């Protein structure tokens, strides 16, 4: 089962292709208020123009623009006011030439009117109105279909629905939408040293931070999670994996994948008939990571070191799981850009290295003043507040503030 370490780009391609080849999740219909973050199961299109009529964006007077010619404070134009319109009204008649309609914000323009003069540029008259400014056609008018035209795609199939999507859909009269069923991911932390959070601490033991962090990250992305931890016993690990594979759509493990005497996961995967996608990635941290498919379900085996687990979760497991969940591939991959370092990093990088970081406004900060110690694979606290990874390519020397580096933003 031993294979050469896979290049990061090739590893990502393999898991994305494997995820794309899986059957799409079942479709369910959800009310809009429960659909935020869920993935559209078909293209959702505008049912009508929005706005559905020409409307006023302000309080004032709807007019024929030709009737305002020459109007100014020195030479006002006076017109009779023949109707009044509020938001929600439907004009009962067209606006005659040479007349004005009192109109409020959001109200539809009557037929014939082609502009709106704000009330501050009038005497605010009720029976007649003096106009203090001339207007051009379509001035101060929100045109029918100006926001979105009937038939336009609001959310393509595979799009995660945001509050903005849902607001636009509600404005189109949608009450419910078809979405893909949320996938359930099993989280298995392995290690006889692990305690569940809340258990009394004992010498030689540590708490299961990976399980909580991995489960929380997947929950943030809309996955349902089943979380467990077990001892370094190959029979127990195999039993737990079988159960999770039965009840879940995919599984993520942490720990037990390196070359230690109790690193049993590679052998357990082989026993379970795993088809390996890759066994090891040529990078730091997280090089021992494994990815496989068992009975049509993806399995990702991460390092037990907290940051190594976090980095490879973001780089490989999250994109593949989002793809399997029905997202379009382009929204699964970590967005890349170039930023300027505000802090340096003191080590050379023989292979590709990824550092947790905080990016904003074209700058990126490596926590811990860029010290190598703060970025050991076992360090967890430096991850707080980070929103990206800085990539230092193979062969890089130490980097200093002011240098340009490649940044990979976490996916949301």
Regions found by a protein language model. Give the residues of each.
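Short, low-complexity N-terminal leaders and the immediately following helix N-cap/first helix
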Residues: 1-73, 327-354
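Flexible glycine/proline-rich
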Residues: 28-33, 37, 42, 88, ...
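Helix-rich terminal scaffold detector
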Residues: 1-9, 177-302, 306-312
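Short, glycine/charged-enriched hinge/interface segments at domain edges or termini
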Residues: 2-3, 62-228, 373-374, 389, ...
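Electropositive phosphate-/nucleotide-binding environments in soluble metabolic enzymes
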Residues: 2-9, 13, 29, 33, ...
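Predominant activation on well-ordered alpha-helical scaffold segments within soluble catalytic domains
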Residues: 12, 16, 59, 119-120, ...
């Amino acid at each position: 089962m031993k294979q050469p370490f896979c290049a990061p780009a090739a590893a990502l391609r393999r898991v994305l292709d494997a995820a794309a080849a899986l059957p799409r999740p079942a479709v369910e219909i959800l009310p809009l208020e429960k659909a935020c973050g869920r993935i559209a199961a078909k293209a959702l299109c505008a049912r009508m123009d929005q706005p559905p009529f020409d409307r006023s964006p302000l309080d004032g007077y709807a007019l024929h623009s030709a009737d305002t010619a020459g109007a100014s404070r020195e030479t006002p134009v006076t017109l009779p006011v023949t109707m009044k319109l509020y938001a929600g009204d439907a004009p009962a008649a067209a606006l005659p030439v040479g007349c004005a309609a009192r109109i409020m914000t959001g109200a539809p323009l009557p037929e014939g009117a082609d502009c709106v003069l704000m009330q501050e540029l009038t005497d605010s008259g009720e029976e007649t109105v003096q106009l203090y400014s001339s207007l051009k056609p379509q001035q101060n008018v929100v045109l029918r279909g100006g926001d979105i035209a009937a038939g336009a795609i609001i959310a393509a199939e595979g799009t995660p629905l945001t509050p903005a999507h849902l607001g636009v859909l509600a404005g189109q009269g949608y009450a419910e939408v078809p979405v893909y069923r949320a996938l359930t991911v099993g989280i298995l932390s392995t290690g006889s040293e692990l305690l569940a959070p809340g258990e009394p601490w004992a010498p030689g033991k540590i708490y299961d931070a990976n399980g909580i962090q991995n489960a929380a990250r997947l929950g943030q992305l809309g996955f349902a999670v089943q979380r467990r931890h077990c001892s370094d016993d190959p029979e127990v690990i195999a039993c737990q994996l079988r159960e999770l594979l039965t009840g879940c759509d995919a599984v993520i493990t942490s720990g037990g994948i390196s070359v230690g005497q109790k690193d049993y996961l590679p052998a357990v995967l082989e026993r379970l008939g795993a088809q390996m996608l890759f066994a090891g990635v040529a990078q730091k941290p997280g090089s021992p990571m494994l990815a496989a498919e068992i009975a049509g379900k993806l399995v990702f085996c991460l390092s037990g070191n907290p940051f190594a687990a976090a980095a490879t979760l973001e780089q490989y497991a999250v994109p593949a799981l989002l793809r399997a969940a029905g997202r379009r591939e382009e929204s699964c991959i970590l967005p890349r850009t170039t930023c300027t370092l505000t802090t340096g990093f003191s080590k050379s990088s023989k292979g590709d290295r990824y550092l947790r970081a905080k990016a904003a406004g074209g700058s990126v900060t490596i926590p811990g003043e860029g010290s190598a110690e703060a970025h050991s694979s076992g360090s967890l606290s430096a991850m707080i507040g980070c929103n990206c990874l800085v990539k230092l390519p193979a062969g890089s020397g130490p980097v200093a503030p002011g240098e340009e580096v490649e940044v990979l933003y976490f996916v949301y």
